[in-house]
């Protein structure tokens, strides 16, 4: 039964043709260099998320899958928790409350409305609650509302308060029994220990010490002889001798044990666990039972019970029922430990099963499992329900039995709060990475060892971060972050799936008597260790026999060797089986160093969507599937004919007579400020099939992932301007918007009720000219289409200001003219520093329109500003091989090097970036890019027939027109000799010239002089990505701005509109040059001399000389700190007189500030803010 859960077998017919883009109707024809046939299509890339959530809510689709797998009575996650909880009994046992049948109503609002109105995409959860009065037998049943339950969208995400979030799967150590060995430093003896780790409850640890006695630790308390525990469980000395008589160390432990009988042993354990409490036999017996043998306190979980049974060879043929420890488990664990210490290879357990005796590797994927989204939410609900259980028990005792109904007992607040807390604040519920479709897809397939119950990055060692042989086909060895999280966060491999126990499985083709079949078995890492596995590219004949006598295989632990074909059990299904989706999109990955491939996989996720997407000339065949499963393209649900197409929607009349309308997302803002826009790629009257892509999204072209642009690249130095990874670009890319992207920023402001009155959104703003208000409508909100720059008003808002004390002059003026100035201040929403763009959208939410707003908020306005960013110096570009760089110079087209036919190159990369980084894949991509762009024709009609280098190529690769798109799958792509042959077979241009030689180099001419460069240069097409590290977001300048309240020094950082810190080392430089006055200015009037700052400004305005600096505020802070340490510090002048330190209430300062119109009020965010 258990083996059945772990092994899922599916078959495919042997005649299945190679999976290419053609398996998706209407897909572009990408010519593949793959030599191997894949017998299995890539599974749904979001299944790890969607199937787990389906299990949680008990969806019909999940039940059908579970039944097909052989589960007789599948139980959903919510149902499981409610069954665990039920019944809740009161303290006397006279009444009980049980829950069953969780079900959902319709979701409250569609996904788009939830995003728009900051709502949570959720459905109301109802359960049937049954109250039973055990004294009278009376039963009251009610349907109870358990709160709004966040639902998963079709794309595997959650919408929480209007933002899209992803719950990341967590890699944790599986519950079970783990044997370990260590070397004692003093005696150099090999010592063994074992931990029994439950899903929930106390740990039980046994170990053999250097004195050769077997000890036990219960719940991490003091060690005691293991025989004490056996006696406490009711064993006599004779029984212990009978079972463990073979072992000297057990016998010596029994001799040293002073307890005589069960009662004494129980009391001994009680004293260790509860020191200071008076021990009694009953309390000791209850304590031991509660610790390990009661389901309320101890839970091995199904997976823990399965692992214990498997390791110790217990009840392997029976279904899993108990989730607590049993006496048999404890005894078998002790025997296994003893036999391990004595060096025995196997152990025969009662029932005649023989199990191998060996230590465990805790980093092995047989011992690490995934907590997927369903289980993580289930655990949180369990926490909420246990809090609710306490409330129910209290209410049972306080309320009148006759009046009790399930509704009066239940308080759903703890459950709702637990779910909200998880989605809002958990480390595993993350703001979705929406930079581009690939980043979102990868985020949903991420595996994290961090989070509650997991590791912490500070304590994680090298072993747990390292690549392990059991990761093969389960977790990608390439894709992981650089930095402190390296190895702790990974990505699921392409073909991997998660089984019901949470272990990751990978598929293999069954090999029977040396014949490879198309039967697919999914194996866990444990299962795989028992078998001999051949690699996917082992040569086969048409019948599936291995063509070579000796086959390269791997055995347990990743050991590689040659064996005869009859010894092989399984074979990989695909060469890309071991890598993740992002890594599988790197062509020629096999020629890249792993460190650079890691950067390449990570940087594809940082690519920004461009105005015009362009699919790569050189792909891997993964682009189409990744784009469709990412969910940003629109896919036809049914076959039919397109009736109507517009920029906003597509209407399809299906063959069954139903009409389907697909709406496009138009210029929406993603979580990362990039532009998500969909556009149709079908025409009215066109026939579409089910599953066909009908509209492209961001970063897609014709349904394929298109993260960058195919650019003509020359790899050469150029006047030193591309030194150290700098990049030289052609101005054509700027003028023709080749690398232009659109970025959308959201600006929000609300009008609240304040103590002094309500704030108001209005056009009537004090002290603002009509010129500034020109783009505001009558409500005070900027019009759509307005061009705005930093400092421009987007939404006018005024806030009531407290009445100030009037001067006698003002009172006189008011008495004469009877004019009362409006006591409001301008708190309008303005465009932040360094930002500009065009207003493309406005959303107004108001209480009057019955919109849901937070307490105290009357109106909320959102303004969307779009910015078109052309490529510029300082932007970061990258290829797919970790070859990244910053643009150092943009040259006019006429100055760029050009080919013999006059074509200027688009981009110049330095040659030094290749050899030491060992990412040769970029060079091969460049060559194949040129071949694909030019087209080719292999001369097979000549006297020699098919050339040697082309013998392994399929016939469809013998010729191709120009602008073909090709696929070179990872580990199964174009070979070097094929590339050389193809370069020699490229089609000539319109003048009949072939410009690139067989070695991939061309003669280039200097655009400035027209002279040829002395050596041939590698030229071809490389796929270049524009990354999210844009110079516009980083460049920053300040003249005057906000100051820190305490030190009065300028703030730091672009976000605070801060200044550039002139630090300690910079001061040393000034001192070294003797620049005393410059240094004095920097430390005083340019920084935190509050009086001096204003006086200097006054002097500059009036054209006077700069006055002497005063005392910096930070010096006053230093004095205050010393005084707070009870040190009396006085400042003396040169003649010994004490100088009084005043806190900035200088009359000169106030007068000068008033004359200059500067507000020095401490209530303002800055003491000197608007000097204009």
Curated annotation (Swiss-Prot):
Q: Which reaction does it catalyse?
A: RNA(n) + a ribonucleoside 5'-triphosphate = RNA(n+1) + diphosphate
Subunit relationships? The RNAP catalytic core consists of 2 alpha, 1 beta, 1 beta' and 1 omega subunit. When a sigma factor is associated with the core the holoenzyme is formed, which can initiate transcription.
Name assigned to this protein? DNA-directed RNA polymerase subunit beta
EC number, as in UniProt: 2.7.7.6
Keywords in alphabetical order, please.
DNA-directed RNA polymerase, Nucleotidyltransferase, Transcription, Transferase
Show the Pfam families listed in the entry. Answer: RNA_pol_Rpb2_1 (PF04563), RNA_pol_Rpb2_2 (PF04561), RNA_pol_Rpb2_3 (PF04565), RNA_pol_Rpb2_45 (PF10385), RNA_pol_Rpb2_6 (PF00562), RNA_pol_Rpb2_7 (PF04560)
Q: Which PROSITE patterns match?
A: RNA_POL_BETA
**Its function?**
DNA-dependent RNA polymerase catalyzes the transcription of DNA into RNA using the four ribonucleoside triphosphates as substrates.
Q: What pairs make up the disulfide bonds?
A: none
Q: What enzyme class is recorded for this protein?
A: transferase
Which Gene Ontology cellular-component terms appear in the entry?
Answer: DNA-directed RNA polymerase complex
Family from the record: Belongs to the RNA polymerase beta chain family.
Q: Which GO terms describe its biological process?
A: DNA-templated transcription
């Amino acid at each position: 039964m258990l083996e059945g859960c772990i092994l899922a077998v599916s078959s495919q017919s042997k005649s299945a043709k190679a999976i290419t883009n053609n398996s998706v109707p209407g897909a572009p024809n990408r010519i593949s260099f793959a030599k191997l046939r894949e017998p299995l299509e890539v599974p749904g890339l979001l299944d790890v998320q969607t199937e787990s959530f389906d299990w949680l809510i008990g969806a019909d689709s999940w039940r059908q899958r579970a039944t097909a797998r052989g589960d007789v009575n599948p139980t959903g996650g919510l149902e499981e928790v409610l069954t665990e909880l039920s019944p809740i009994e009161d303290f006397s046992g006279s009444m009980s409350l049980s829950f069953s049948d969780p079900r959902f109503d319709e979701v409250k609002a569609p996904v788009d409305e939830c995003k728009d109105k900051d709502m949570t995409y959720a459905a109301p959860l109802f359960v049937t609650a049954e109250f039973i009065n055990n004294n009278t037998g009376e039963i009251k049943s009610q349907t109870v509302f358990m709160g709004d339950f966040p639902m998963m969208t079709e794309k595997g995400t959650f919408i929480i308060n209007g933002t899209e979030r992803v719950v990341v799967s967590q890699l944790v150590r599986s519950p079970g029994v783990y044997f370990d060995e260590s070397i004692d430093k003093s005696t150099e003896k090999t010592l063994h220990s074992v931990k029994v780790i439950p899903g929930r409850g106390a740990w039980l640890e046994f170990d053999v010490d250097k004195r050769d006695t077997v000890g036990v630790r219960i719940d991490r308390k003091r060690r005691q002889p293991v025989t004490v525990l056996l006696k406490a469980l009711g064993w006599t000395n004779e029984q212990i001798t009978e079972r463990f008589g073979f072992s000297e160390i057990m016998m010596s432990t029994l001799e040293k044990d002073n307890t005589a009988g069960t009662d004494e042993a129980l009391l001994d354990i009680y004293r260790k666990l509860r020191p200071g409490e008076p021990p009694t036999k009953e309390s000791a017996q209850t304590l031991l039972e509660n610790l390990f043998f009661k389901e309320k306190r101890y839970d091995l979980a199904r997976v823990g019970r399965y692992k214990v049974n498997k390791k110790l060879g217990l009840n392997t043929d029976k279904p899993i029922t108990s989730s607590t420890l049993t006496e048999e488990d404890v005894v078998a664990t002790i025997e296994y430990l003893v036999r391990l210490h004595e060096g025995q290879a196997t152990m025969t357990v009662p029932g005649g099963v023989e199990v191998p005796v060996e230590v465990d590797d805790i980093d092995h994927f047989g011992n690490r499992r995934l907590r997927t989204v369903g289980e993580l939410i289930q655990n949180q609900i369990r926490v909420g329900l246990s809090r609710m259980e306490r409330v129910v028990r209290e209410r049972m005792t306080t309320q009148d039995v006759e009046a009790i109904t399930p509704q009066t007992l239940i308080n759903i607040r703890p459950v709702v709060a637990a779910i909200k807390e998880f989605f809002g604040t958990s480390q595993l519920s993350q703001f979705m990475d929406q930079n581009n479709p690939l980043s979102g897809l990868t985020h949903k397939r991420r595996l994290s060892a961090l989070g509650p119950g997991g590791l912490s990055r500070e304590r994680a060692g090298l072993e747990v971060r390292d690549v392990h042989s059991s990761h093969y086909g389960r977790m990608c060895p390439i894709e992981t972050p650089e930095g402190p999280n390296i190895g702790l966060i990974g990505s699921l491999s392409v073909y991997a799936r998660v089984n019901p126990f949470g272990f990751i499985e990978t598929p293999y083709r069954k090999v029977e008597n040396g014949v490879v079949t198309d039967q697919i078995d999914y194996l866990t890492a444990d299962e795989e260790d028992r078998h001999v596995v051949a690699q996917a590219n082992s040569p086969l004949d048409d019948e599936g026999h291995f063509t070579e006598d000796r086959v390269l295989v791997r055995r347990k632990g990743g050991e590689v060797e040659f064996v005869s074909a009859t010894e092989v059990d399984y074979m990989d299904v695909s060469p890309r089986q071991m890598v993740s989706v992002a890594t599988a999109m790197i062509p020629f990955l096999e020629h890249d160093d792993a460190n650079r491939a890691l950067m390449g996989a990570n940087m594809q996720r940082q690519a920004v969507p461009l105005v015009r997407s362009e699919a790569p000339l050189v792909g891997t065949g993964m682009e189409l599937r990744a784009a469709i499963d990412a969910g940003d393209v629109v896919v036809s649900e049914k076959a039919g004919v397109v009736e109507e197409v517009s920029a906003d929607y597509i209407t399809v009349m299906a063959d069954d007579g139903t009409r389907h309308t697909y709406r496009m997302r138009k210029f929406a803002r993603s979580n990362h400020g990039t532009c998500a826009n969909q556009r149709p790629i079908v025409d009215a009257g066109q026939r579409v099939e089910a599953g066909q892509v009908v509209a492209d999204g961001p970063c897609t072209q014709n349904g394929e992932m298109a993260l960058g642009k195919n650019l003509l690249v020359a790899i050469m130095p150029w006047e030193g301007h591309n030194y150290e990874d700098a990049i030289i670009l052609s101005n054509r890319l700027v003028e023709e918007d080749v690398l232009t992207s659109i970025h959308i920023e959201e600006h929000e402001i609300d009008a609240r009720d304040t103590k002094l009155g309500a704030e108001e959104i209005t056009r009537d703003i004090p002290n603002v000219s009509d010129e500034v208000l020109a783009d505001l409508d009558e409500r005070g909100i900027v019009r759509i289409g307005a061009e705005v720059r930093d400092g421009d008003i987007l939404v006018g808002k005024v806030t009531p200001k407290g009445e100030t004390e009037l001067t006698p002059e003002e009172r006189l003026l008011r008495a004469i003219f009877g004019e009362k100035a409006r006591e409001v201040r301008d708190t309008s929403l303005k465009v932040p520093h360094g930002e500009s763009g065009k207003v493309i959208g406005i959303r107004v939410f108001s209480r009057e329109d019955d919109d849901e707003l937070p307490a105290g908020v009357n109106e909320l306005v959102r303004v969307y500003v779009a910015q078109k960013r052309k490529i510029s110096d300082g932007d970061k570009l990258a290829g797919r091989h970790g070859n990244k760089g910053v643009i150092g110079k943009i040259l006019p087209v006429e100055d760029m090097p050009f080919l013999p036919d006059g074509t200027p190159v688009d981009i110049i990369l330095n040659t030094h970036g290749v050899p030491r980084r060992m990412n040769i894949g970029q060079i091969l991509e460049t060559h194949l890019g040129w071949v694909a762009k030019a087209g080719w024709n292999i001369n097979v009609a000549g006297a020699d027939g098919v050339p040697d280098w082309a013998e392994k190529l399929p016939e469809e690769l013998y010729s191709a027109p120009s602008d073909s798109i090709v696929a070179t799958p990872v580990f199964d792509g174009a070979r070097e000799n094929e590339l050389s042959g193809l370069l020699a077979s490229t089609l000539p241009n319109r003048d009949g010239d072939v410009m690139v030689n067989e070695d991939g180099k061309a003669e280039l001419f200097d655009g400035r002089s027209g002279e040829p460069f002395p050596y041939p240069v590698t030229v071809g097409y490389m796929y270049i990505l524009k990354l999210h590290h844009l110079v516009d977001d980083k460049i920053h300048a300040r003249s005057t701005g906000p100051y820190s309240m305490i030190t009065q020094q300028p703030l730091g950082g672009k976000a605070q509109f801060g200044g550039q810190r002139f630090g300690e080392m910079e001061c040393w430089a000034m001192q070294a040059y003797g620049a005393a006055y410059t240094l004095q200015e920097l430390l005083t009037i340019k920084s935190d001399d509050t009086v001096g700052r204003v006086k200097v400004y006054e002097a500059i305005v009036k054209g006077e000389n700069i006055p002497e600096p005063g005392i910096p505020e930070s010096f006053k802070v230093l004095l205050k700190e010393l005084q707070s340490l009870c040190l009396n510090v006085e400042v003396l002048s040169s003649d010994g007189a004490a100088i009084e330190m005043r806190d900035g209430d200088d009359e000169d300062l106030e007068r000068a500030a008033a004359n200059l119109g500067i507000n020095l009020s401490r209530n303002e965010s800055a003491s000197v803010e608007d000097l204009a």
